A protein has these predicted regions:
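AMP-binding/adenylate-forming catalytic core of the ANL superfamily
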Residues: 1-80, 92-96
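Conserved C-terminal "lid"/linker of ANL adenylate-forming enzymes
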Residues: 5, 30, 72-124
Length: 124
């Protein structure tokens, strides 16, 4: 089954390439693009635990670095595929919380459910 996001404007977007581009950032270990039935794309990203430890768990310290990265990668994609907002998750996505399959693929619906408050805040 293909992962396709259909925006509120009816555009079909394949999130995989955008997520791969987000994960080019040295501190980002996981990225999930959000945007199904939404006006714009956003993303939730998890920071590599070692990098987070180096920052003493201060995930806000990654905010500007990740924002610069997002601005850079957005230039590669069509306007409709631009990530407008992102949130840094306080932990990695994992199998224990049902967010990953045994082969480490992301279960989008579970991520949406588990992080609904974080996701909804980006669209307020």
């Amino acid at each position: 089954k293909k992962d396709i996001i259909i925006t509120a404007g009816g555009k079909n977007i394949a999130p995989k390439n955008i997520e791969a581009a987000l994960m080019e950032h040295p501190a980002i270990c996981q990225a999930v693009v959000i945007g199904d039935r939404r006006k714009f794309l956003s993303a939730v990203v998890a920071i590599d635990p070692e990098k987070a430890a180096e920052a003493n768990g201060d995930l806000n310290s990654f905010q500007s670095s990740v924002q610069e990265h997002v601005d850079t990668i957005n230039k590669r994609f069509a306007r409709v595929e631009h990530v407008r907002k992102f949130s840094i998750l306080p932990r990695e996505l994992d199998q224990d919380n049902g967010e990953l399959t045994p082969t480490m693929k992301i279960k989008r619906r579970i991520v949406h459910d588990n992080w609904a408050d974080v996701i909804d805040a980006m669209y307020e």
